[in-house]
């Protein structure tokens, strides 16, 4: 079963990559772009058939390793 964990910096935490991407987009002529936040997407293939258990495992992975909960938040979703 495939799961996706998306990790983002919490609101209020400085995001230098997001600022750089936003600046580059403005330089390329995309003047209508506002704030940009950059994050990470981790897709995992789990040997699991129960979607609820796969989601629970992805949540635990996010809490224990994939996200720094002091400055980041995460979401986990089952894809298939």
Model-derived regions, located:
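Short glycine-/aliphatic-rich beta-strand segments at the starts of folded cytosolic domains
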Residues: 1-11, 40-44
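Short, intrinsically disordered low-complexity segments
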Residues: 37-56
């Amino acid at each position: 079963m495939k799961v996706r964990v998306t990790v983002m910096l919490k609101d209020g935490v400085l995001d230098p990559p997001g600022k750089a991407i936003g600046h580059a987009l403005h330089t390329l002529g995309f003047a209508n772009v506002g704030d940009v936040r950059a994050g990470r997407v981790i897709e995992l293939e789990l040997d699991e058939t129960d979607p609820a258990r796969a989601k629970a495992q992805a949540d635990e992975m996010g809490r224990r390793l994939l996200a720094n909960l002091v400055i980041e938040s995460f979401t986990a979703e089952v894809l298939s």
